Amino acid sequence: MMSKQDAAKAPVNPIVLGKMGSSYGIRGWLRVFSSTEDAESIFDYQPWFIQQAGQWQQVQLESWKHHNQDMIIKLKGVDDRDAANLLTNCEIVVDSSQLPDLEEGDYYWKDLIGCQVVTTEGYSLGKVIDMMETGSNDVLVVKANLKDAFGIKERLLPFLDGQVIKKVDLATQTIEVDWDPGF
């Protein structure tokens, strides 16, 4: 399906932007799940890489469109349902160099998910499992630790730099916040 030349390329610093879902129809279309902040941004970053049988392959996006609640894609060389089914659940990866550089204080959502959230007093609030966009600011969805002293399962913290968010350390995957652990 892929030429040798395509397979030779591999992302230097791979970043997962989404995942391919189930096949759609008989002509090789696939559903796609995007984890970029604005779902359609995933199409701005090309080329895409996927890993099959431990090998990196570059895939070419031929076309994409909205279908009901989903976005569906057509990849070059994937022309029937069987070929599409082989790609179901493949992660869509790009090289970090393809992403725009961030300004100081901006973070990619994907970098924040998985971080431990600790208050300035040292209380562990749990782990970021998701991000939500609200009108005014982004919100961290923090899953509390199993034996949370306050019996809280999940906390929603506004991502307000300086006000709530005191420090983000991606190296240690820690976010320090000024937050009352009772909430």
UniProtKB/Swiss-Prot annotation:
GO terms for cellular component: cytoplasm; ribosome. Keywords: Chaperone, Cytoplasm, Ribosome biogenesis, rRNA processing. It is found in: Cytoplasm. GO terms for biological process: ribosomal small subunit biogenesis; rRNA processing. It comes from the Bacteria. Residues 104-183 form the PRC barrel domain. GO terms for molecular function: ribosome binding. InterPro entries: PRC_barrel-like_sf (IPR011033), PRC_RimM (IPR056792), RimM (IPR011961), RimM_N (IPR002676), RimM_N_sf (IPR036976), Transl_B-barrel_sf (IPR009000). Pfam families: PRC_RimM (PF24986), RimM (PF01782). Binds ribosomal protein uS19. The PRC barrel domain binds ribosomal protein uS19. Belongs to the RimM family. An accessory protein needed during the final step in the assembly of 30S ribosomal subunit, possibly for assembly of the head region. Essential for efficient processing of 16S rRNA. May be needed both before and after RbfA during the maturation of 16S rRNA. It has affinity for free ribosomal 30S subunits but not for 70S ribosomes. This is Ribosome maturation factor RimM. It comes from Cronobacter sakazakii (strain ATCC BAA-894).
